[in-house]
From Swiss-Prot:
GO molecular function: magnesium ion binding; phosphopyruvate hydratase activity
Organism: Methanocella arvoryzae (strain DSM 22066 / NBRC 105507 / MRE50)
Binding site for (2R)-2-phosphoglycerate: Q150, K321, R350, S351, K372
Enzyme class: lyase
Enzyme Commission number, as recorded: 4.2.1.11
Cellular compartment(s): Cytoplasm; Secreted; Cell surface
Functional description taken from the UniProt entry: Catalyzes the reversible conversion of 2-phosphoglycerate (2-PG) into phosphoenolpyruvate (PEP). It is essential for the degradation of carbohydrates via glycolysis.
Protein name: Enolase
Names of required cofactors: Mg(2+)
Pfam families linked: Enolase_C, Enolase_N
Reaction catalyzed: (2R)-2-phosphoglycerate = phosphoenolpyruvate + H2O
Family indicated by similarity: Belongs to the enolase family.
Cofactor note: Binds a second Mg(2+) ion via substrate during catalysis.
GO cellular component: cell surface; extracellular region; phosphopyruvate hydratase complex
Name of the coding gene: eno
C-alpha cells in the first residue's frame, strides 16, 4: 500500500468558507478522502491554517514528491515527514489545514487497503461508543448579540445505546425551541446549529435546564447539562467582560463554581482564559469531583501544553481537535498523555465543518468518553450518523463508562 497519488481541491464548509479536501491513493487501488474544518473561536496556540489556494500550492510544490512512495500504513512516519517538510512548530508553512486533511486521508487510505473501518484500523478490537455532547443554545463567537456564554450543551450519559443518545440530544434541541417560542422569543441558529436567541444568560439557563429535565423524564434516563464558556473571548487582559458586568479572575471562578452547583453541570469547557493554568487548577480543586473541567484553548491538543496542565493540576478533561495540532499521530499522543494522568478526553468538531466524518472514527478508535459534534445540521449529523453505523458493527449498547 504505497502512496502513488495525492490530489487536493477547494471545497466549502458549513459557513460557506473555503477549505481544503485531500485524496490519497495507494498502489493497490485504494484511497482515502478527508477535509479540514475551521474554528470561529480559536486558541492562540493552534496549528495555523493558511489560505486554501496557498495550501494546495504548497502541497504541489513541497509535499507531494516527499510522500509519493511512502508506506501509507506507517502513520507516524507520514506525520513525521509532514512536520519535517513544514519546518515550523505550528504548521505555519504548509498549513495545519493541509496537514490534518492529508494525515487523515492517509489513515483512511491505509484502512481501506486493510479492508477495515478506520476506527478498527486505528483502535483495535474492543472499541466503545462515546456519549454525544451537543450544542442546543448559544452565542459568543458563534452568534453575535446572543448569550455571552458561547455554548449551552447537553449529553445523555444515561442513554443505553448510541441511537438513543443521539435521539435524546435532538429532542432537547427541539424542546429548547418549543420553550423559546412559547416565551415569545425569536429563534435563530448559530454556527453549530444551536439556537441563538437574543436573551440573557440567566434566561438561557432557565430554558435549557427545563428542556433537559423534561426530556430526561420522558425518556427515562439521565441527560446532563454543560457549557462552553469560551472565556478567552470574554477576557480583556484584566477582567471577563459580560454584557452587564465585569468579573475578575476570582469572581469568574466563583461564578462558574456557583453555576456548576446550581444547575448540576456535568461539563464546563474553557471556564477561564487560555493561559490561566492556576485558575483552572483552583476551579478543578473546588468542583472537579463532580464536573468535567475541560480545556480547549488551554490545551489546544498540544502535548507540551497538556504537560503544563498536568504539572499544575489544571482541569480534568481535554478537548481534542485534530486540526488544532495538525496530524493523526499528534492527536493520538495528546489523548494518550491525558489518559495516563487521569484526564477524560472529548473529541470535537469545529464551528466551520464539512460532511467529513473522520472524527467519529477517531473518537471510537482512541477511546474518548465524549464526542462534541453538534446536534443538527448536515455537517453535524454526518458524524452522528456515522457513530450509529459504527454502533451497528460493534454493538450500539457498548457505551463508554461515564467519567463521573
Amino acid at each position: 500500500m504505497i502512496i502513488d497519488e495525492i490530489l487536493a481541491r477547494k471545497i466549502f464548509d458549513s459557513r460557506g468558507n473555503p477549505t481544503i479536501e485531500v485524496e490519497v491513493y495507494t498502489d493497490d487501488g485504494n484511497y482515502g478522502v478527508a477535509a479540514a474544518p475551521a474554528g470561529a473561536s480559536t486558541g492562540s496556540y493552534e496549528a495555523v491554517a493558511i489560505p486554501v489556494d496557498d495550501a494546495i500550492a504548497k502541497l504541489e510544490s513541497e509535499v507531494i514528491d516527499q510522500l509519493i512512495g511512502e508506506y501509507a500504513a506507517d502513520q507516524e512516519e507520514i506525520d513525521r515527514l509532514l512536520h519535517e517538510i513544514d519546518g515550523t512548530d505550528n504548521f505555519s508553512n504548509i498549513g495545519g489545514n493541509l496537514s490534518v486533511a492529508l494525515s487523515m486521508a492517509t489513515a483512511k487510505a491505509a484502512a481501506a487497503s486493510f479492508k477495515m473501518p478506520l476506527y478498527r484500523y486505528l483502535g483495535g478490537a474492543f472499541p466503545t461508543m462515546p456519549y454525544p455532547l451537543g450544542n442546543v443554545l448559544g452565542g459568543g463567537a458563534h452568534a453575535k448579540g446572543a448569550t455571552d456564554i458561547q455554548e449551552f450543551l447537553v449529553t445523555p450519559i444515561g442513554a443505553p445505546n448510541i441511537d438513543q443518545a443521539v435521539y435524546a440530544n435532538t429532542l432537547v434541541h427541539k424542546r429548547v425551541k418549543k420553550l423559546l417560542t412559547e416565551a415569545g422569543i425569536i429563534c435563530h441558529k448559530g454556527d453549530e446549529g444551536g439556537w441563538a436567541p437574543q436573551i440573557k444568560d440567566s434566561k438561557a439557563f432557565e430554558i435549557v435546564s427545563k428542556a433537559v429535565d423534561e426530556v430526561s423524564g420522558e425518556l427515562g434516563f439521565e441527560i446532563r447539562f454543560g457549557l462552553d464558556v469560551a472565556a478567552t473571548e470574554l477576557w480583556d487582559g484584566n477582567n471577563y467582560v459580560y454584557k452587564d458586568t465585569k468579573r475578575t479572575t476570582e469572581q469568574q471562578i466563583d461564578y462558574i463554581a456557583g453555576l456548576i452547583d446550581e444547575y448540576n453541570l456535568y461539563y464546563v469547557e474553557d471556564a477561564l482564559q487560555e493561559n490561566d493554568y492556576e485558575g483552572f487548577a483552583r476551579l478543578t480543586e473546588m468542583v472537579g469531583d463532580r464536573c468535567l473541567i475541560c480545556g480547549d484553548d488551554l490545551f489546544v491538543t498540544n502535548v507540551s501544553r497538556i504537560e503544563k496542565g498536568i504539572e499544575n493540576l489544571s482541569g480534568n478533561a481535554i478537548l481534542i481537535k485534530p486540526n488544532q495540532i495538525g496530524t493523526v499521530t499528534d492527536t493520538y499522543n495528546a489523548i494518550r498523555l491525558g489518559r495516563q494522568y487521569g484526564y477524560s478526553t472529548v473529541m470535537s468538531h469545529r464551528s466551520g465543518e464539512t460532511t467529513d466524518n473522520t472524527i467519529a472514527h477517531l473518537a471510537v478508535a482512541f477511546g474518548c468518553e465524549l464526542i462534541k459534534t453538534g446536534v443538527v445540521g448536515g455537517e453535524r449529523i454526518a458524524k452522528l450518523n456515522e457513530l450509529i453505523r459504527i454502533g451497528e458493527e460493534i454493538g450500539n449498547d457498548r457505551m463508554t463508562e461515564s467519567p463521573l
